[in-house]
């Protein structure tokens, strides 16, 4: 039987080769020529490391040769250095197989297959063999479906594998997300795109860099069926396409983009063309839009060609760049965006200028480069986001019921898998048997989720007391996401770190710790131990600046070689002797740590530093030597407003450094556990003053209004070396009093979750104000809302009024896990909306539909509503507190 299977496989392969052996991957000769030219340029850029040897394989078919050339012509450096050619060939053959075996394979246009099926890379994730693994699981599940229904089915499969959970910025590979059983939206959408492409369905990740009306961003998926692109929420199956919880927020968006692998010649607006991808703008698919032209002039009124023009949205208390253009010879550039406000920041040669642009109201804007570092200014800016204009497809009650039934089954499948992760009891017993710290081990193994066996195996190899202590410390130094996907050989490698510093803290954080920035962890210490001579190691340890000079001389920096990818591994940089600046910095720190020299990338400023007993020494590769920065102090006075006594970094204010080019670089302070009210605040950072490099900065503050608008202020600051700069941190206020915006019957009944009794809101809450929330269990907008409320637990408990949280039905109540939101105020009452309170709110407040959740109102027993929020809103807790403090 096995021999027959092998013979069948060989026959299938021979038939496939015969069918496409001499066929072209690119039938357009002119496009094929352009790809060949781009490929030759890529090869010329990377002469070292023997990175393209797979193309010398004489057995490659014409199709495979061209497909490989297409991939290598445009793939970022990390994909060339960190994955062998055989990996890319395997994926080409897997995509061919899907095209042959799936019923829609022959109907996919060549250009869509080339750009949206063949490429393995979706965004900046780590690559893996997901295409092969997923195809085996999905092929029989979708092969008898229409293309439209297959897209829906693949998303149901993804929901079996993962649900939403926020995490850090490093993007997990698709298989790591499946192993973990959750991921943030960027990881869920990467998973879904990978799964769709595995069965030959064109798919792409759509990303709004920042929402205009709330402090967050989001990613979802578009898939192609029957001649058009449809959108869907990844791992959030709906009965139909073009439906998701984000329909309404997306209609308020100002920019939606996707990165298309290679040179793409589609119909969408092109934002930029880079050596690795074409960035397109798909905002027209989601919201009403308008075009605007920007003219940049100097102070004499002359057009400025090749000026950098950044289109910025207020989000997370900074003006974040969502699109960058350069002016033409006439000093002009343009953008299509949603009908709201952006800040346009133009710069060239150290001069800069800025102005607000209201898309839909202004067709043209002139920005004058009338400022430079050192100028003093304070500017108030009122930002208005686009209005909501969502169009939702119809879903029948039968479709909704069937979808809900399937979601419940999928939840049970995923939960059964998660139930096989190690339990706390088993983790503690393991720690006891191996003489390890029980509390630490239990926390680590539970955090590792599907990767716990790797972590446990590593722990079994810790034999001595010192190694046990050091090994646990190593696991505590790396991130929670690292625990979920790190390999055993990586952990073993870094446990063998050289000890050259007597400072134990430096050794733990800046030598043994494998984590430098946002890179995937690799066993680079063993690698460097093999490729760097003993004599060079001794020289670099004695004089680390010699190592700086070597890197500056031997590692070529190309800012465009790795766009759209994670950092190149240290091993990859060594092989190619080429890197983007960030990968070069990680390479240097990794190289230093491999020799026992403490080094880091400063989290706030992004500067590379050597760590000595005398402090941090900045590394300057351009000067190839020490660069001791001149420092000063910045302090700010703050007069509390009624609803805010201690502004938070990223929520209410940020600080950015003005670069020599005239643009802004955010100081990236630790966010802390923001869900629990952590992170940097005015009192911890600026009340007594903080040390900064001397130079010019911009302080941005902003008050987010319930409407989504912002009252912002920008203030320029100059920090002098050895001096102290004092400024004011001003939170602008909306002086209008809280207004009655609707009515709601406080005698409305609900069923209490505890006891199952029907009770009116008046009975449950007593006379006065109260909050009612209608929840969408396990939906991302509701999860965000509950975490926001948890972060302001103390304020809401101090207020003392009841928060009635209602589930739409008993089934939804059964899915809710109170332990996931243990930080909610003690004034919460849970219930079930058996009397359709949601419909009453929707009708009275003129909301569009009741199934867009969550819905929150603040009302009183005189039946007056003073606050309403529906759907996706970041900072809900703060908005609630701001409103109740104004009552």
Residue ranges and their predicted role:
Residues 25, 136, 140-145, 150-156, ...:
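Hydrophobic/aromatic-rich core segments of domains that either
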Residues 226, 328-344, 348-351, 357-360, ...:
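Short Pro-Gly-centered beta-turn/loop motif in secreted/extracellular proteins
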Residues 350-372, 704-732:
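Structured interaction patches on ligand/partner-binding surfaces of diverse proteins
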Residues 851-870:
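A short, hydrophobic beta-strand/beta-hairpin element that forms part of a small beta-sheet core
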Residues 818-853:
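Short, internal strand/loop/helix patches
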Residues 299-318, 339-341, 543-546, 641-672, ...:
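Short, ordered, surface-exposed loop/turn motifs in non-cytosolic proteins
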Residues 760-789, 802-806:
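Short active-site neighborhood of thiol/selenol oxidoreductases, capturing the structured segment around
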Residues 27-183, 216, 401, 410-576, ...:
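Secondary-structure boundary elements
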């Amino acid at each position: 039987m096995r021999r027959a299977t092998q013979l069948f496989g060989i026959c299938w392969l021979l038939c496939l080769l015969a069918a496409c052996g001499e066929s072209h991957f690119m039938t357009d000769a002119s496009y094929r020529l352009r790809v060949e030219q781009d490929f030759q340029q890529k090869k010329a850029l990377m002469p070292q490391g023997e990175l393209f040897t797979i193309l010398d394989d004489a057995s490659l078919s014409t199709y495979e040769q061209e497909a490989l050339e297409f991939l290598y012509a445009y793939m970022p450096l990390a994909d060339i250095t960190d994955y062998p050619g055989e990996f890319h060939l395997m994926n080409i053959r897997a995509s061919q197989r899907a095209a042959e075996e799936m019923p829609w394979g022959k109907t996919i246009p060549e250009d869509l297959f080339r750009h949206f099926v063949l490429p393995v890379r979706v965004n900046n994730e780590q690559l893996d063999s997901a295409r092969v693994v997923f195809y085996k699981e999905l092929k029989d599940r979708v092969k008898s479906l229409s293309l439209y229904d297959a897209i829906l089915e693949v998303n149901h499969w993804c929901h079996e594998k993962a649900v939403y959970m926020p995490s850090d910025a490093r993007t997990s590979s698709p298989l790591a997300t499946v192993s973990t059983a959750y991921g943030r939206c960027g990881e869920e959408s990467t998973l879904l795109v990978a799964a769709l492409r595995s069965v030959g369905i064109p798919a792409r990740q759509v990303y709004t860099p920042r929402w205009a009306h709330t402090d967050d961003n989001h990613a979802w998926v578009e898939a192609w069926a029957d001649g058009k692109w449809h959108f869907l929420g990844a791992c959030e199956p709906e009965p139909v396409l073009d439906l998701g919880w984000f329909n309404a927020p997306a209609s308020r968006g100002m920019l939606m983009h996707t990165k298309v692998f290679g040179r793409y010649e589609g119909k969408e607006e092109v934002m930029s063309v880079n050596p690795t991808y074409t960035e397109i703008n798909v905002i027209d698919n989601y919201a009403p839009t308008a075009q605007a032209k920007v003219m940049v002039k100097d102070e004499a009124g002359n057009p400025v060609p090749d000026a950098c023009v950044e289109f910025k949205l207020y989000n997370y208390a900074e003006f974040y760049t969502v699109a960058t253009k350069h002016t033409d010879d006439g000093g002009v550039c343009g953008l299509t965006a949603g009908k709201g406000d952006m800040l346009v920041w133009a710069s060239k040669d150290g001069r800069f200028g800025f102005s607000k642009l209201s898309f839909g109201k202004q067709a043209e804007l002139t920005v004058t480069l009338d400022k430079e570092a050192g100028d003093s200014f304070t500017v108030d800016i009122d930002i208005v986001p686009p209005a909501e204009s969502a169009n939702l497809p119809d879903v029948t009650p039968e479709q909704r019921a069937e979808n809900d039934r399937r979601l419940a089954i999928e939840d049970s499948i995923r939960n059964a898998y998660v139930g096989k992760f190690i339990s706390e009891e088993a983790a503690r017993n393991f720690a006891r048997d191996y003489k390890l710290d029980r509390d630490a081990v239990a926390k680590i193994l539970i955090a590792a989720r599907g990767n716990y066996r790797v972590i446990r195996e590593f722990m079994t190899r810790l034999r001595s007391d010192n190694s046990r202590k050091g090994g646990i410390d190593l696991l505590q130094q790396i991130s929670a996401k690292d625990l979920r996907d790190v390999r055993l050989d990586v952990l073993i490698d870094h446990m063998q770190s050289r000890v050259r510093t007597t400072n134990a803290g430096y050794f733990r954080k800046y030598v043994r710790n494998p984590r430098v920035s946002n890179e995937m962890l690799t066993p680079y210490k063993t690698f460097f131990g093999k490729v760097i001579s003993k004599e060079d190691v001794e020289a670099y340890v004695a004089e680390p600046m010699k190592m700086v000079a070597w890197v500056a001389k031997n590692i070529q920096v190309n800012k465009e070689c790795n766009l759209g990818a994670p950092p190149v591994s240290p091993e990859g940089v060594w092989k190619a002797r080429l890197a983007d600046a960030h990968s070069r910095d990680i390479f240097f720190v990794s190289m230093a740590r491999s020799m026992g020299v403490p080094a880091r990338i400063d989290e706030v400023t992004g500067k590379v530093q050597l760590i000595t007993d005398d402090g941090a020494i900045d590394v300057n590769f351009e000067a190839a030597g020490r660069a001791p920065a001149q420092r000063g102090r910045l302090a700010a006075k703050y007069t509390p407003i009624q609803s805010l006594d201690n502004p938070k970094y990223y929520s209410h204010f940020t600080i950015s450094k003005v670069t020599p080019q005239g643009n802004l670089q955010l100081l990236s302070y630790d966010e802390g556990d923001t869900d629990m009210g952590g992170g940097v605040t005015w009192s911890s950072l600026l009340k007594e003053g903080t040390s900064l490099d001397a130079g010019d900065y911009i302080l941005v503050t902003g008050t987010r209004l319930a409407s989504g608008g912002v009252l912002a202020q920008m203030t320029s600051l100059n920090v002098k070396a050895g001096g102290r700069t004092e400024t004011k941190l001003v939170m602008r206020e909306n002086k209008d009093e809280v207004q009655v915006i609707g009515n709601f019957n406080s005698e409305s009944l609900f069923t209490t979750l505890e006891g199952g009794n029907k009770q009116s809101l008046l009975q449950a809450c007593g006379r006065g104000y109260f909050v009612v929330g209608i929840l969408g269990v396990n939906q991302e907008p509701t999860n965000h809302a509950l975490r926001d409320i948890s972060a302001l637990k103390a304020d809401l408990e101090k207020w003392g009024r009841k928060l009635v949280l209602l589930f739409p039905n008993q089934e939804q109540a059964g899915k809710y896990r109170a332990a996931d939101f243990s930080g909610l105020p003690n004034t919460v009452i849970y219930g079930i909306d058996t009397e359709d309170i949601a419909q009453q709110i929707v009708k009275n407040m003129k909301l569009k539909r009741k199934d867009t959740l969550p819905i929150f109102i603040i009302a009183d027993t005189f039946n007056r509503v003073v606050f309403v929020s529906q759907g996706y809103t970041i900072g809900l807790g703060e908005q609630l507190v701001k409103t109740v403090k104004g009552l």
